[in-house]
Amino acid sequence: MTIMTSVMQFAMLPLQGIAQGAQPITSYNFGAKNAGRVKKTFRLLLITCLTYSIALWAAVMIAPQMFVKIFTSDSTLAQFASPMLRIYLGGLGLFGIQIACQMTFVSLGNALCSMVVAIMRKFVLLVPLIYLLPTLIENQVMGVYMAEPIADAIAVTFTAVLFTMQFKKALRKMEEPSNPIDTL
């Protein structure tokens, strides 16, 4: 499991870096009420994050042993961990959506939504699934590994729906004329 979480962290760091790099651009243009640039920045961020996460997902599906061998030289462990890595990171291809939306929430001054989707993924979904799935399937260990991609898929769906609603709301807010008295 440590190998799999290490590979997951390895995958997450560049995604977070890309998304954090877009934050000041999005925030600046949101503050300047430049909706076109906010949309364009988000679109580019989403495409970049999604392309990266799909490419990494494909690499893990094609050659999981390559990633496992970064963290262990034990061939028996690598032989067991490689197919499990495919299962554990099954939702990685969609993870670019999660990160792009989460970081854009923060850029638009909506850190609460960002926190909600982060908590949703790990605590509301993953922890209960880790306990529930082993009771529902015969191979209990497989149930634990399957919890991660299932939680990821549900969380990405929830995030995309919430983001779509909040992003439209933020864009409408930018179109409203500002009241100079409110700035005093």
What are these regions (language model features)?
Residues T26-G91, P134-L184:
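Short alpha-helical transmembrane segments in multi-pass integral membrane proteins
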Residues L125-P134:
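Transmembrane alpha-helical segments of integral membrane proteins
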Residues L15-Q20, Y88-S107, C113-K122, V144-A160:
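Short runs within selected transmembrane alpha-helices of multi-pass transporters and secretion channels
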Residues M1-A58, I62-P64, F95-S114:
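Small-residue-rich hydrophobic transmembrane alpha-helices
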